[in-house]
From Swiss-Prot:
One of its GO terms (biological process) is tRNA N1-guanine methylation. Signal peptide: none annotated. It is found in: Cytoplasm. Homodimer. This is tRNA (guanine-N(1)-)-methyltransferase. It comes from Streptococcus equi subsp. zooepidemicus (strain MGCS10565). GO terms for molecular function: tRNA (guanine(37)-N1)-methyltransferase activity.
Amino acid sequence: MKIDILTLFPEMFAPLEHSIVGKAKEKGLLDIHYHNFRDHAEKARHVDDEPYGGGQGMLLRAQPIFDTMDSIQATKPRVILLDPAGKPFHQSYAEELALEEELIFICGHYEGYDERIKTLITDEISLGDFVLTGGELAAMTMIDATVRLIPNVLGKQASHQEDSFSSGLLEYPQYTRPYDYRGMKVPDVLMSGHHEHIRLWRMEQSLKKTYLRRPDLLETYDFSDEERRIFDKIKSELSEGEN
């Protein structure tokens, strides 16, 4: 995968050279390029200007972005504009991006964008219902979430498939050694060696955690018959506990 990032602050992306993203680069699975679009600004290196019609703040000018995009060699890239008004970023979107060969992220850093910039993009994405100073942190988050899904990036291909949200549910609780730590013991079922019992326990815990913490995820979740039976049992037990 090839990723190009348009930003005023390339140095902010130093953490991407480490951890999973750094390993992907070392394996030759990822190529990242940073483009400071101030270098392409014609007007005394100014990348922002006042909005026509008046208003608060400054807007990112179209010219530096267009010229930077012209300098990037790409065939059919997915061009992502980071914007609080964009569609929310989800795990399913990261899975979609992981299938692409070329991605371009445009990071703003002012009150907004000249609307003409949006003629360059394919996706307008938001990290959530809040506003950041710039798009860099959002881009780094999305890149990390995407790159780890590229085949052969993680040590075990199945390791990301049981992450929270990958299945549509939150992940079940997990434990490691020691068995007993300060009186807190690992659930006996995980020590039993009975794979079917462990599978059912994990399914129940995952459904229960999702129901208690993110019930909105269950509104569109496609339950199997087995999951539906377990989920009904969970709701019944929780209801009895409240009475």
